[in-house]
Every structure is written in structure tokens, then in C-alpha cells.
Amino acid sequence: MRLALFDLDNTLLAGDSDHSWGEWLCQRGLVDAAEYQARNDAFYADYVAGKLDVLAYQAFTQAILGRTEMAQLETWHRQFMQEVIEPIVLAKGEALLAEHRAAGDRLVIITATNRFVTGPIAERLGVETLIATECEMRDGRYTGQTFDVPCFQGGKVVRLQRWLDENGLDLEGASFYSDSLNDLPLLEKVSRPVAVDPDPRLRAEAEKRGWPIISLR
């Protein structure tokens, strides 16, 4: 069985679910909009530039999880899915998932965005295996802290390798689809790296290395 690995944000989605979640919270008046938006945008700019402090970012994004009851978070997320995520699910991305599924490949979404945000999205896309940044839980609610290695840059390789070892799998014949140079460590590990609507830095790298470049837009 070959693996088909997919980044989520700006790969299978026409946008960034993590950043969009923050924008949705601001629009709903659930956080201090001016302060939150400024920090959210600054972190996103750092991500695009490849210099994100992932632990600081996760502390920022998960703070609201730690101070909100689970039932309320689930209600908000259902609204977020309907209002924000559904319109940015890419039909060509779903077709690509279906193509790999029909070929008998094991589908995996591997994303830096936390599991609270991405779990329902992976379910919506019909992908059972999700490797994401983990949110610590205690007594049935989020603590607001990150648990385990953040699934970002080299952390994606660490988290994936652990999952491979636990499941007796390897990367022989594996594909990985991503839009971002932040995913270069994992792109270099697979048999078939594919740049999807890549950012300028990944496009240059893919062209230099002769990697396929595709668009799902």
C-alpha cells in the first residue's frame, strides 16, 4: 500500500483554515478583534516568510480553546465549517483524493494546524488519518497548551515517522502534496513530491529539482 500525503491549507483548501478561524473569531466578536487580527496577521506573515515561531503561535491560537467550554467550541466550529470552510473546499482537491483512493493508496492529511480546527475538515474530506498539531486536554477540556511535537517543518517528519513506525509502514512510493516551502523537509523524504499552487519559494525549489507543479484551483 502506497501513501498519499496531503498538506491541508492552501493545498486541499483555497485558504488557510488556521488563519481563517482567527478571522472568524474576530468577525463574530468572540475575541478582541483589533489586537487578535494584528497578531494573527503577523504570525501568518512569519509563516509565509518561513520564520514562524510555532510554539508562540500555538500558544496564541489555543488560548481561546483553554478558556472556552467544549460544547461552545463545537458549536462555533460547526458554524465555522458551514460559513468558511465549505466555500473553500477545492473540487479538484477532492477529485485528487478520490483518484488516490481508487488506486488503493492510504490517504493522510498532515498539517501544522491544530487538531481542533482540522479534525472536522479531514472528516468532511473523507480522510481517516490526520496528523496535526495536538492540543493538550485535561478533564474533558482543552488546556490551551500544545501537546507533543508541533507538526510543522521538520516536526512533520518526526510526527510522520512515529506514525509510520506505529503502523508498520514506510515511504516507499509515497506522494506528498504541498503548497509551502515550510514543508521542504517532508517533500525531500518522499518518492514523489508535488508542489500544489506553490508559494514563490517552493515554486523556485520545485523548478530547480524538477518536481511536478500542479494547480487544484
From Swiss-Prot:
Pathway: Amino-acid biosynthesis; L-histidine biosynthesis; L-histidine from 5-phospho-alpha-D-ribose 1-diphosphate: step 8/9
Reported cofactor(s): Mg(2+)
Cofactor note: Binds 1 Mg(2+) ion per subunit.
Disruption phenotype: Inactivation of the gene results in growth defects and incomplete auxotrophy of the mutant due to a deficiency in histidine synthesis. The growth defect of the mutant is rescued by expressing hisN from C.glutamicum.
GO MF annotation list: hydrolase activity; metal ion binding
The keyword Transmembrane helix is annotated on this UniProt entry: no
Domain of life, per lineage: Bacteria
Entry-linked InterPro entries: HAD-like_SerB, HAD-like_sf, HAD_hydro_SerB1, HAD_sf
Annotated GO biological process: L-histidine biosynthetic process
Pfam families, sorted: HAD
Keywords per UniProt: Amino-acid biosynthesis, Histidine biosynthesis, Hydrolase, Magnesium, Metal-binding
Xref: SUPFAM superfamilies: HAD-like (SSF56784)
EC numbers for this chain: 3.1.3.15
Catalytic function, reaction form: L-histidinol phosphate + H2O = L-histidinol + phosphate
Active site residues per record: 7 (nucleophile), 9 (proton donor)
Binding site for Mg(2+): 7, 9, 179
Function per UniProt: Catalyzes the dephosphorylation of histidinol-phosphate to histidinol, the direct precursor of histidine.
Database matches in PANTHER family: PHOSPHATASE RV3661-RELATED, PHOSPHOSERINE PHOSPHATASE
Similarity remark: Belongs to the HAD-like hydrolase superfamily. SerB family.
Listed name of the protein: Histidinol-phosphatase
Upper taxonomic lineage: Bacteria, Pseudomonadati, Pseudomonadota, Gammaproteobacteria, Pseudomonadales
